[in-house]
């Protein structure tokens, strides 16, 4: 009964070959500097990948550097404290709670919040198992407001 996940996700077509393209004008060092510069401007790993693809013509970072954008950020100490997908879900939940404060009779939004928070809890459980989050980390809606606002 996965009624919330029936639609496809839009995405760009990935390059067919895993080796770096021959027309690429950037060296691996320059790409790492670009990634660090974009991270310092406040962009997340997925947004950095999109900017590198659209503005700099770098289709994929991994075949060129041998590591992904998140790994580069982790090496340089610029990675976000929470995984990006979890942070976006928490941000969505905070916005939905704000909506429900203004519209308490919106039952469809209430159901959406229940589903969203259960998705957050499942993702937290996964990240605890993988060692990405500390074992005592818990999702708290009140603390999430502070987390998202910073």
UniProtKB/Swiss-Prot annotation:
Molecular function terms from GO: small ribosomal subunit rRNA binding; structural constituent of ribosome
Record protein name field: Small ribosomal subunit protein uS15
Pfam families: Ribosomal_S13_N (PF08069), Ribosomal_S15 (PF00312)
Self-association and partners: Part of the 30S ribosomal subunit.
Cited PROSITE patterns: RIBOSOMAL_S15
UniProt key word Endoplasmic reticulum: no
Gene Ontology cellular component annotations, sorted alphabetically: cytosolic small ribosomal subunit
Gene: rps15
GO process terms (BP): translation
Keywords (A to Z) from UniProt: Ribonucleoprotein, Ribosomal protein
SMART domains recorded: Ribosomal_S13_N, Ribosomal_S15
Source species: Aeropyrum pernix (strain ATCC 700893 / DSM 11879 / JCM 9820 / NBRC 100138 / K1)
Family statement: Belongs to the universal ribosomal protein uS15 family.
Region annotated Disordered, chain positions: 1-22
């Amino acid at each position: 009964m996965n009624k919330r996940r029936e639609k496809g996700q839009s995405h760009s077509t990935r390059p067919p070959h895993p080796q770096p393209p021959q027309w690429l004008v950037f060296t691996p060092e320059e790409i790492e500097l670009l990634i660090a510069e974009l991270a310092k401007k406040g962009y997340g790993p997925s947004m950095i990948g999109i900017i590198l693809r659209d503005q700099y013509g770098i289709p994929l970072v991994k075949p060129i550097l041998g590591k992904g954008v998140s790994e580069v950020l982790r090496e340089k100490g610029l990675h976000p404290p929470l995984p990006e997908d979890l942070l976006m879900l928490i941000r969505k939940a905070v916005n939905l709670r704000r909506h429900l404060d203004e519209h308490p009779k919106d039952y469809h939004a209430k159901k959406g919040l229940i589903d969203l928070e259960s998705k957050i809890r499942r993702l937290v459980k996964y990240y605890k198992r993988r060692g990405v989050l500390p074992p005592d980390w818990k999702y708290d809606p009140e603390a999430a407001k502070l987390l998202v606002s910073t």
